[in-house]
């Protein structure tokens, strides 16, 4: 019964009233990206855009995007929940409501949002609900948090296009990706920033469906 209750708490979204309260103080994070030396929090050059993408464990997802041409800088953190300035330990309880996400700062003149969304949908399984592979809990849900109305509309169209591709491929499951405007992003602890650059042999749970996302 204890294990069932624990799993249920991890896979059920809390309400604002039941979520952990958190704290006023933000977590300490480095000023610059471990790989490319660019500022994690800005300021960023004019013309860049930002989107927040959740693909399960953020370690592998962040590496995927910092290696993508046109992505200027990345950072990992928590979004989509209620707890203020949550810690990693708090998010893993499922009692903050947050998802692990990657902040992707990109140059749309080099890589389009469609290009990023293609990577997003192809490189994880967006049909798994409150889990990603062996990682179970609300924090590992698939999510897209937009910073503009245009991003929001494109994300919804990309989801619909990929759902059609999954159906045609006989995948048989509905996309569960949460899509909405970003409300608040909280940076994760220093330890998690660019984790797989600091720990090259570390865990990466990214697994796609094998279905192509053909969006223009």
Curated annotation (Swiss-Prot):
Which Pfam families does its entry note? Answer: PMSR
Q: Where is the signal peptide?
A: none
Q: Which UniProt keywords apply?
A: Oxidoreductase
Q: Which GO terms describe its biological process?
A: cellular response to oxidative stress; protein modification process
One GO cellular component term, please give it.
Answer: cytoplasm
- Name the residues that span the membrane: none
Q: Which domain of life is it from?
A: Bacteria
Q: Which residues form the active site?
A: 57
Is Oxidoreductase set as a keyword in this record?
Answer: yes
Tell me what reaction this enzyme catalyses.
Answer: L-methionyl-[protein] + [thioredoxin]-disulfide + H2O = L-methionyl-(S)-S-oxide-[protein] + [thioredoxin]-dithiol; [thioredoxin]-disulfide + L-methionine + H2O = L-methionine (S)-S-oxide + [thioredoxin]-dithiol
- What Gene Ontology molecular-function terms does this entry list? L-methionine-(S)-S-oxide reductase activity; peptide-methionine (S)-S-oxide reductase activity
Entry's EC annotation: 1.8.4.11
* Protein family membership: Belongs to the MsrA Met sulfoxide reductase family.
Known PANTHER family for this protein? Answer: MITOCHONDRIAL PEPTIDE METHIONINE SULFOXIDE REDUCTASE
Outline what the protein does.
Has an important function as a repair enzyme for proteins that have been inactivated by oxidation. Catalyzes the reversible oxidation-reduction of methionine sulfoxide in proteins to methionine.
> What protein is this chain from?
Peptide methionine sulfoxide reductase MsrA
Q: Per the UniProt entry, what species is this protein from, by scientific name?
A: Agrobacterium fabrum (strain C58 / ATCC 33970)
């Amino acid at each position: 019964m204890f294990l069932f209750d624990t799993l249920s708490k991890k896979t059920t979204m809390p309400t604002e009233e039941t979520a952990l309260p958190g704290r006023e103080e933000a977590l300490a994070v480095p000023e610059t990206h471990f790989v490319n030396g660019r500022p994690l929090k800005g300021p960023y050059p004019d013309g860049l855009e930002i989107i927040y993408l959740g693909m399960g464990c953020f370690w592998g997802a962040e590496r995927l995007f910092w290696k993508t041409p046109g992505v200027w800088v990345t950072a990992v953190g928590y979004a989509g929940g209620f707890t203020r300035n949550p810690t990693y330990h708090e998010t893993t309880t499922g009692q903050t409501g947050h998802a692990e996400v990657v902040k992707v700062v990109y140059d749309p003149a080099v890589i389009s949002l469609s290009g990023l969304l293609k990577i997003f949908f192809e490189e994880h399984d967006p049909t798994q609900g409150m889990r990603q592979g062996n990682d179970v809990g609300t924090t590992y849900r698939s999510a897209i948090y937009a910073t503009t109305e245009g991003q929001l509309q494109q994300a919804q169209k990309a989801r619909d296009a990929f759902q059609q591709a999954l159906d045609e491929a006989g995948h048989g499951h509905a996309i569960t990706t949460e899509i909405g405007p970003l409300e608040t992003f909280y940076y994760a602890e220093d330890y998690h920033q660019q984790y797989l650059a600091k720990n090259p042999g570390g865990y990466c749970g990214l697994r796609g469906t094998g279905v192509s996302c053909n969006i223009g």
